From Swiss-Prot:
Belongs to the TPP enzyme family. Keywords: Decarboxylase, Lyase, Magnesium, Metal-binding, Thiamine pyrophosphate. GO terms for molecular function: magnesium ion binding; pyruvate decarboxylase activity; thiamine pyrophosphate binding. Pfam families: TPP_enzyme_C, TPP_enzyme_M, TPP_enzyme_N. It comes from Schizosaccharomyces pombe (strain 972 / ATCC 24843) (Fission yeast). GO terms for cellular component: cytosol; nucleus. This is Probable pyruvate decarboxylase C186.09. InterPro entries: DHS-like_NAD/FAD-binding_dom, PDC/IPDC-like, THDP-binding, Thiamin_PyroP_enz_cen_dom, Thiamin_PyroP_enz_TPP-bd_dom, TPP-bd_CS, TPP_enzyme_TPP-bd, TPP_PDC_IPDC. Homotetramer. It comes from the Eukaryota.
Length: 572
């Protein structure tokens, strides 16, 4: 924000809506995603008065929440505004995803007039009861802070608290604003530092954790580093790279941390994902006697159905606010601070690098298929690899797109986005939309399956509306392939669509979206060429492949996850 005080002065006299707008801008929000509804219309008017905020309309509340989630990936924080119950209930899905993925999204919901609280009135958009607190109570379960403004005098304190918690905890928060409250006067905002003051480490515990950890690491034969998904949200990527350079050991990354460490780095050892690992990463982790796990989270998905977990005895675990080493835990130690300080005390040890060079595959290049042969996944990956550059951000949706994305080698500064913890199919389309608004200079490319696309296709219309040149590769194999591999059944077959035609239908005579259907390598290459030239709107390339064409990694992963899901109850 150019001048926080200027933004405050622009809002005189201050109302609650104006106050919220100023605080959003001070927190770093430049765009807010909205679906209008009668309980939030007055608030939307107030937000529009702020010159530092731009309103972005969404097609529905699920997409609105996911668009804000994607914006938070690019911008560091996001906000979305919906109406009561019929809007917020739908948005809760995406907010749950933001919580799972450590993304600070501020969910703002209008709500009934305060005069109706405690009255005998039954209102629309409610459950048909006289208790209107249920949405606030629900929001508390999926946010790190939830506030409901019932008295204008409380608004500044409650708004500040919620936004500050979002920034500190990197989790979503909820702010409920009754329809008659947004225009009520309140105190003017104070300094931005009241909400943006960063958290700091406990210096005593930090030093103790670093000293003990350095002694242990320096006494080991083959230390390695493992990058986890929390590095990005908690701004620890640079500190992690600093430690990697100081220790000079092999570095593997979890699948949901791809691009958080440069793949061009000489010590990069690939993706650690059990039998779905790349470049021999599983071996280098399993052979290590000291694994520094930085910002890692192990779930059934990221551990390949619990089949790939680092040996606990060899793990030094660095979480976002604590370090666990040799059965000792040091709280109040921030991830970034610990990595930065540890880098000063470790000794270089390239034993794991020397060992890794002996097992690293010589080449990952995929041979070119006959241009006229039926299209397959390998040829799609080969051609997308040539499309990716340092300005690219690659989104991979839940499904076989994950495994295809892992095979893409990222040049330095390229980014990779995945939603592995929440795992909502269709997430990538609205999230990429929000990301493109937050990072307009990035080239956004999406891998999405046909079943996933059917969940959230409406947001393509907003890409058309805002002339966003997002390129989407829709892998059409006529079904939910990821679920087929976990547990097959007739419910995994879906109705085929003419996806290319649907995308162009969103133009309605005035947009610039393009849709292509391709069935071989030659057609795919031509579609990519035209997609690169289309700078005024989205391009969807429908890649038709055989229904049985899926990666062997997905088959293995699906088997392991299915086995974990099907484990019988413990005997009493």
């Amino acid at each position: 924000m150019k001048d926080n005080q200027q933004a405050v002065q622009l809002q005189q006299p201050t109302t609650i809506g104006h106050y919220l707008a100023v605080r959003l801008a001070q927190a770093g929000v430049k765009h807010h995603f909205v679906v209008p509804g009668d309980y939030n219309l007055g608030l939307l008017d107030k937000l529009q008065y702020n010159n530092y905020l731009e309103e972005v309309n969404c097609a529905n509340e699920l997409n609105c929440a996911f668009a804000a989630e994607g914006y938070a990936r690019a911008n560091g924080i996001a906000a979305c505004v919906v109406t009561y119950s019929v809007g917020a209930f739908t948005a809760f899905d995406g907010i749950g995803g933001a919580y799972a993925e450590d993304l600070p999204v501020i969910l703002i919901s209008g709500s009934p007039n305060t005069n109706d609280i405690g009255s005998s009135h039954l209102l629309h958009h409610t459950l048909g009861t006289h208790d209107f607190s249920y949405q606030y109570e629900m929001a508390k379960k999926i946010t790190c802070a939830a506030v409901s403004i019932q008295r204008p005098t409380e608004a500044p304190r409650l708004i500040d608290y919620a936004i500050k918690m979002a920034l500190l905890k990197k989790k979503p928060v909820y702010i409920e604003v009754p329809t008659n409250v947004a225009s009520q006067p309140c105190a003017a905002p104070g300094p931005a530092s009241l909400i943006t003051e960063p958290e700091t480490s406990n210096q005593e515990y930090l030093q103790m954790a670093v000293d003990i950890s350095a002694k242990i690491v320096n006494g080991k034969q083959k230390p390695v580093l493992l990058a986890g998904p929390k590095l990005r949200s908690f701004k620890a990527e640079s500190a992690f790279l600093e430690l990697a350079n100081s220790l000079n050991c092999s570095v593997a990354v979890m699948p949901n941390a791809k691009s958080f460490f440069p793949e061009s780095h000489p010590n990069y050892a690939g993706i650690y994902w059990g039998q779905a690992s790349t470049l021999g990463a599983e071996s280098i982790i399993n052979w290590s006697d000291c694994i520094i796990c930085a910002g890692t989270t192990f779930t059934d998905y990221s551990s390949n159905g619990w089949t790939s977990l680092p040996p606990k005895a060899n793990v030094l675990h660095v979480d976002v606010d604590r370090v666990t080493v040799s059965d000792a835990e040091f709280g109040g130690v921030l991830l970034r601070d610990f990595l930065h300080e540890l880098a000063k005390k470790v000794k270089a040890n390239n034993a794991s690098v020397v060992e890794y060079k002996r097992i690293r595959p010589e080449s990952l290049e995929i041979p070119m298929e006959n241009p006229k042969a039926a299209l397959n996944r390998k040829e799609i990956i080969r051609q997308v690899q040539n499309l990716v550059n340092q300005e690219t951000t690659l989104f991979v949706d839940t499904g076989d797109s994950w495994f295809g994305g892992m095979r893409i080698t990222l040049p330095e500064k390229a980014r990779f986005e995945i939603e592995m913890q929440w795992g909502h199919i269709g997430w990538s389309v609205p999230s990429a939309f929000g990301y493109a608004i937050g990072a307009p200079k990035r080239n956004v490319v999406v891998f999405v399956g046909d079943g996933s696309f059917q969940e959230t296709v409406q947001e393509v219309s907003q890409m058309v509306r805002l002339n966003l040149p997002i390129i989407m590769f829709l892998i059409n194999n006529r079904g939910y392939t990821i679920e087929v591999e976990i547990h097959d059944g007739p419910y995994n077959r879906i109705k085929n669509w003419d996806y290319a035609a649907i995308v162009e239908a969103f133009n309605a005579g005035e947009g610039h979206a393009k849709g292509f259907r391709v069935g071989n390598g030659h057609e795919l290459a031509e579609a990519i060429r035209q997609a690169k030239e289309n700078s005024q709107g989205p391009t969807l390339i429908e890649c038709n492949i055989d229904q049985d064409d899926c990666s062997k990694e997905l088959i293995n992963w699906g088997h392991n996850v299915g086995a974990a899901n099907g484990k019988p109850p413990a005997k009493e």
